[in-house]
C-alpha cells in the first residue's frame, strides 16, 4: 500500500486546462490529485457522465458553479459533484490549490471524463460578476 509525499509527486499540466498543474495518484477504484490553479484559471463549464467527484479546497479561493448554485469556496470547503452535474471553478484573488477524488479510476487522468457543457459562456459571465462583487 503506497504512501505519497505531495512535495515529491511529479507535477503535470492538466489536459483540459494546461495552465493548471496536477499531481495524481491512482488506485483500483479511485483517482485523486492535488490541483493548482493560477488566478482566474480553470476549464469551462463541464460535466462527467461516468465519474463522481469530491473536491476539498486547501489554499486560496475558488469561484465555483455547481448545477444551479454558485459560491466562493475557501480552505476547508468540501464540494460534492455528482455525475452529470454541470460545474466549473476559477481561482479568484490569487492562485488556489485543492484536493480532488474521482471514481471510478478509469485510466488515471483526472480529465478523462471531461465533457464541455452547454452554457459554458454564461458561466464565464457569472465569474466576471463574482470578481466585481468580491474585489
Show where each model-derived region lies:
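Double-stranded beta-helix
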Residues: 3-5, 9, 29-31, 88-135
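Short beta-strand His + acidic residue motifs that chelate non-heme Fe in jelly-roll/DSBH
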Residues: 45, 64-65, 81, 87-93, ...
